[in-house]
Amino acid sequence: MTTIVSVRRGDKVVIGGDGQVSLGNTVMKGNARKVRRLYHDKVLAGFAGGTADAFTLFERFESKLEQHQGNLMRAAVELAKDWRTDRALRRLEALLAVADKETSLIITGNGDVVQPENDLIAIGSGGPFAQSAARALLENTDLNARDIVQKALTIAGDICVYTNGNQTIEEEESIAEDKTKQGKK
């Protein structure tokens, strides 16, 4: 598997992932690029799960983004509909974490589209470790989004055997409201 984590803080949204590709209990590749920019570099996307499956989903998702002029939510919902109804797509085992300047979403293999609480996404085998680390850093530090993603991936890589330290991190400007400081005094 892998670890993908996304954080939105201040005027940035960041997605990062590790580079390990495993086949069973064997590391096949250590420098895979599981985080990419889509739709004229305006959408960030990362995947966890089967590599070939994820590339198929990336292609489909980018096609939906083009079809809906970069509307992230609409493209995600349309991809999820296809995923649920297309027999070939239903067999794909992957998760996508996607974000643009306004929205962060998880698209699941069950065809669900989830907008996570506080725009914090962590998927893959190291996801729970990265999510815990990122949440603690969001709530207890003033680190920027990129530093939080980097530290969360490092912590996940130290704990999860299916996650390595080779990180790919992409960031984009954000205009969404920063929910991490709401209700705090």
Curated annotation (Swiss-Prot):
Known EC number: 3.4.25.2
InterPro entries to which the protein is assigned, alphabetical: ATP-dep_Prtase_HsIV_su, Ntn_hydrolases_N, Proteasome_sua/b, Proteasome_suB-type
GO molecular function: metal ion binding; threonine-type endopeptidase activity
Subcellular location, principal: cytoplasm
Keyword entries, A-Z: Allosteric enzyme, Cytoplasm, Hydrolase, Metal-binding, Protease, Sodium, Threonine protease
Role noted for this protein: Protease subunit of a proteasome-like degradation complex believed to be a general protein degrading machinery.
Subunit structure of this chain's protein: A double ring-shaped homohexamer of HslV is capped on each side by a ring-shaped HslU homohexamer. The assembly of the HslU/HslV complex is dependent on binding of ATP.
Protein name (database record): ATP-dependent protease subunit HslV
Protein source organism: Idiomarina loihiensis (strain ATCC BAA-735 / DSM 15497 / L2-TR)
